[in-house]
């Protein structure tokens, strides 16, 4: 029967599933994300202290949103699993030990943000739980005041209870701005709210009573008011009336209405407007409706009030025109002296008006230019947005494999690949040299960004291919490619004169092969390394002559020929080559002319010459030589010493021999003992030889620490991978990283898709990672030793989970015996 999960209080809501998908340790991480989205306190913080931080969801959010080099410290009663770039402490925030540990960790630093998401163990009673949480918040505030920098933030969780208001009052005394909020991720049925305190005042001294719960949460007794206090002693002054205004009815004239600076305010205070001027009363704009509206303004609506304002505007224009006419008539009647003064004042007025007009025109021009510039900037922004939108759509199409990068449906007839053979004549050559750079720029800008990485990937594949091949295989591949290039050059020399319309000025005919080889040889031998090659050739001749003389003397001293070495196909081939080369050497001894240089210029290496000489040594001895008469003293050539790889005991013994001559003499003297085994191993049985080596060996006076030191060095050397293995692992890692990047891009495209459901997204993501081979995990196999009397079918043993394999103890013994047999056979060889 299936086990029923905990679904009370809608525990598994969307934030629960989001925390599972995004990797947060708790759903409360989204509370901090939403608080930071509103108040923006994590982006500018350089140091953060998280109290009651387990299991570490808020620490994960802080590490994500804060700068990389920030200091993040988390404290809780229970241990917190390690997080990158986060320091965790297991302490009680109500104790002095926690304060000392924080001082040790922070040193002289002051934190910018203090977080507190702590809550006590609940379940006793609501009143007790609320008080415990308020007391815990007060202790967190006490720690925050010790380590918070000036202007820092303090974010804490508080339960809504009767202790909430005292806490809020204490926060307001210590911080500049205090706001209470409830993020969307907090459950509606929960009594928790979050208080964000910003702008820490950092007072020089804080009263200890603030952090004493007995004083902070003390109930204040409200004294009851007496009846005499409730009775008002003096009647308050009436409000809403202007001082000195004894009546509410105000009658005004039309002249006052026309002179009013604020006509709307004038109409709100007036009750009636009397038309006392005859000219204004006879004006065409003064209709019967206007007269009726002027009699009682308090009852007018918006439409009638607007008609009164329009009537006022017409009357003001009429009065202004009339005043101008009167001013002109008055100017005519002025005397000549007054006329001069008037002209000067008029000129000044005209000049001032012209300056005012110029200023207005300049301001208008500046406004027009600013508007045009703003329109141009808006147009550029619109074009840029459009271009970015098209590029994003193209990238999404490529990521979703709806379109291939670099493939266009348009015709590619004229925009094919460039070829020299298409240029025929001087005119086409000039067109190519001039070029169309604008077209090239537009072509490059139209290309998608994904095409940029194609050439790099191809180069990486070529380099990885060269690193995979051995030197011999690489040389063979290069030789094969050179032969192909030579064949292609030979075919390119064939000239089809009938099909060509003109001569291509860029195609140059190739020279003959012999001429090219001679030029390459002359360039090669003109290097500085071949400057003293003549002297080297003379020395080589002298050495070869000395070797021949020494061989002939050894041949005379030996009565019988040595047995011929075992020959195979390679040795026979080399011996035949050596027989052909012997006469050339004798000719080189007698004649040191141009042939000497030719023989020294051969491409064969010195190691091959030495091998050939060793193979043909038996045949040269049988021929004999007349070189004894020359009287050369030949020094015998010693065979190269074969170095033996020492085990840790041998290395320790060598260190003792190299460090002390006395120890060396003692070791040599002690080697002559009764355990010395001087018999020939071939004449004795193998089992006897092995037992003697195992049991009749005298222990060497070696230091165990020294032997262990060399054994450890050997283990370190053996643990290092060889170059080919390291390169193969690096190539495999590079391929996996490349595949992972491609899969991530596809996964982002799937996640950003809106048309499919979450279940379909998860299925597509699983298929993507399965195709990329990133979700494969090696299956763990548990080996279980079978007991006697157990049949073929074995039940799952107790305590074993997952895949298990039953093995036999007999199998272990057989494998041990096989290893011994292989070791024995290896010794025989």
From Swiss-Prot:
Crosslink feature (Glycyl lysine isopeptide (Lys-Gly) (interchain with G-Cter in SUMO2)) location: 570, 626, 642, 661, 693
A GO cellular component entry from the record: preribosome, large subunit precursor
Residues that bear Phosphoserine: 333, 335-336, 345, 353, 531, 544, 575, 659, 671
Role according to the record: RNA 2'-O-methyltransferase involved in the processing of the 34S pre-rRNA to 18S rRNA and in 40S ribosomal subunit formation.
Gene3D superfamilies xrefs: Vaccinia Virus protein VP39
Protein name, entry field: pre-rRNA 2'-O-ribose RNA methyltransferase FTSJ3
Presence of the UniProt keyword Transferase in the record: yes
Organism lineage string: Eukaryota, Metazoa, Chordata, Craniata, Vertebrata
InterPro entries membership: RNA_methyltr_RlmE (IPR050082), RNA_MeTrfase_FtsJ_dom (IPR002877), rRNA-MeTfrase_E (IPR015507), rRNA_MeTfrase_SPB1-like_C (IPR012920), rRNA_MeTfrase_Spb1_DUF3381 (IPR024576), SAM-dependent_MTases_sf (IPR029063), SPB1-like (IPR028589)
BP GO annotations: maturation of 5.8S rRNA from tricistronic rRNA transcript (SSU-rRNA, 5.8S rRNA, LSU-rRNA); maturation of LSU-rRNA from tricistronic rRNA transcript (SSU-rRNA, 5.8S rRNA, LSU-rRNA); RNA methylation; rRNA methylation
Binding site for S-adenosyl-L-methionine: 56, 58, 76, 92, 117
Organism field: Rattus norvegicus (Rat)
Residue stretches of biased makeup (Acidic residues): 336-346, 354-363, 456-473
Residue list for modification Citrulline: 389, 766
């Amino acid at each position: 029967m299936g086990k029923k999960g905990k679904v009370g209080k809608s525990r598994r809501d969307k934030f629960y599933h989001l925390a599972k998908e995004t990797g947060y340790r708790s759903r409360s991480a989204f509370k901090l994300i939403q608080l930071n989205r509103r108040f923006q306190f994590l982006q500018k913080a350089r140091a953060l202290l998280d109290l009651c931080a387990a299991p570490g969801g808020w620490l994960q959010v802080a590490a994500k949103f804060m700068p990389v080099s920030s200091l993040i410290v988390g404290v809780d009663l229970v241990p917190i699993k390690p997080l990158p770039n986060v320091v965790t402490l297991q302490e009680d925030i109500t104790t002095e030990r926690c304060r000392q540990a924080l001082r040790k960790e922070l040193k002289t630093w002051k934190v910018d943000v203090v977080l507190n998401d702590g809550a006590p163990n609940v379940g006793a009673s609501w009143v007790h739980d609320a008080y415990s949480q308020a007391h815990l918040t007060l202790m967190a505030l006490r720690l925050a005041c010790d380590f918070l920098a000036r202007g820092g933030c303090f974010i804490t969780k508080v339960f809504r209870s009767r202790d909430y208001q005292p806490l809020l009052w204490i926060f307001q005394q210590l911080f500049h701005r205090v706001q209470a909020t409830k993020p969307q991720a907090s459950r509606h049925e929960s009594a928790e709210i979050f208080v964000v305190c910003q702008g820490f005042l950092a007072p020089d001294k804080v009263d200890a009573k603030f952090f004493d719960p007995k004083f902070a949460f003390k109930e204040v007794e409200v004294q009851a008011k007496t009846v005499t206090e409730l009775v008002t002693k003096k009647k308050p002054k009436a409000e809403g009336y202007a001082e000195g205004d004894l009546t509410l009815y105000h009658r005004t004239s039309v002249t006052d209405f026309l002179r009013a600076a604020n006509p709307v305010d004038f109409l709100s205070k007036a009750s009636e407007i009397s038309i006392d001027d005859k000219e204004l009363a006879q004006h065409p704009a003064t209709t019967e409706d206007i007269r009726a509206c002027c009699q009682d303004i308090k009852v007018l609506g918006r439409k009638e009030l607007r008609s009164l304002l329009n009537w006022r505007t017409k009357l003001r224009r009429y009065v202004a025109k009339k005043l101008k006419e009167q001013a002109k008539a008055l100017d005519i009647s002025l005397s000549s002296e007054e006329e001069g003064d008037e002209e000067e004042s008029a000129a000044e007025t005209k000049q001032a008006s012209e300056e005012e007009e110029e200023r207005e025109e300049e301001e208008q021009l500046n406004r027009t230019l600013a508007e045009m510039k703003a329109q141009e900037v808006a147009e550029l922004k619109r074009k840029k947005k459009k271009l970015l939108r098209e590029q994003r759509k193209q990238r999404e199409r490529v990521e979703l494999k709806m379109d291939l990068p670099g493939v266009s449906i348009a015709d590619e007839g004229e925009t094919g690949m460039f070829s020299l053979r298409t240029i025929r004549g001087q005119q086409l050559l000039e067109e190519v040299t001039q070029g169309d750079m604008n077209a090239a720029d537009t072509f490059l800008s139209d290309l998608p960004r994904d095409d940029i990485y194609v050439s790099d990937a191809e180069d990486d594949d070529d380099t990885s291919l060269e690193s995979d091949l051995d030197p011999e295989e690489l040389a063979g591949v290069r030789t094969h490619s050179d032969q192909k290039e030579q064949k292609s050059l030979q075919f390119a020399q064939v000239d089809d004169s009938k099909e060509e319309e003109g001569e291509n000025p860029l195609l140059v005919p190739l020279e003959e092969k012999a001429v090219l080889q001679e030029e390459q040889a002359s360039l090669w031998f003109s290097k500085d390394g071949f400057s003293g090659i003549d002297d080297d050739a003379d020395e080589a001749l002298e050495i070869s002559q000395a070797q021949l003389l020494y061989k002939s003397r050894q041949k005379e001293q030996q009565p019988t020929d040595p047995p011929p070495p075992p020959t195979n196909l390679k040795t026979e081939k080399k011996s035949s080559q050596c027989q052909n080369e012997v006469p050339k050497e004798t000719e080189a001894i007698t004649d040191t002319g141009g042939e000497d240089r030719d023989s020294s210029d051969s491409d064969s290496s010195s190691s091959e010459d030495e091998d050939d000489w060793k193979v043909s040594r038996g045949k040269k001895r049988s021929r004999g030589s007349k070189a004894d008469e020359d009287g050369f003293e030949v020094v015998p050539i010693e065979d190269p010493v074969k170095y033996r790889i020492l085990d840790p005991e041998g290395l320790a013994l060598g260190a003792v021999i190299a460090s002390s001559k006395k120890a060396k003499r003692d070791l040599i003297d002690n080697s002559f003992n009764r355990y010395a085994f001087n018999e020939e191993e071939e004449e004795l049985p193998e089992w006897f030889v092995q037992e003697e080596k195992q049991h009749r060996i005298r222990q060497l006076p070696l230091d165990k620490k020294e032997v262990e030191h060399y054994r450890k060095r050997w283990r370190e050397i053996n643990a290092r991978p060889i170059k080919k293995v390291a390169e193969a692992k690096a190539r495999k890692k590079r391929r996996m990283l490349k595949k992972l990047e491609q899969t991530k891009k596809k996964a982002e495209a799937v996640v950003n898709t809106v048309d499919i459901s979450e279940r379909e997204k998860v299925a597509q993501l699983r298929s993507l990672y399965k195709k990329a081979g990133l979700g494969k995990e090696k299956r763990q196999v548990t080996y279980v030793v079978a007991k006697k009397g157990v049949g073929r079918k074995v039940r799952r043993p107790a305590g074993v989970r997952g895949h298990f394999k039953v093995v036999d103890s007999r199998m272990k013994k057989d494998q041990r015996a096989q290893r011994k047999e292989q070791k024995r056979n290896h010794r025989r060889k």
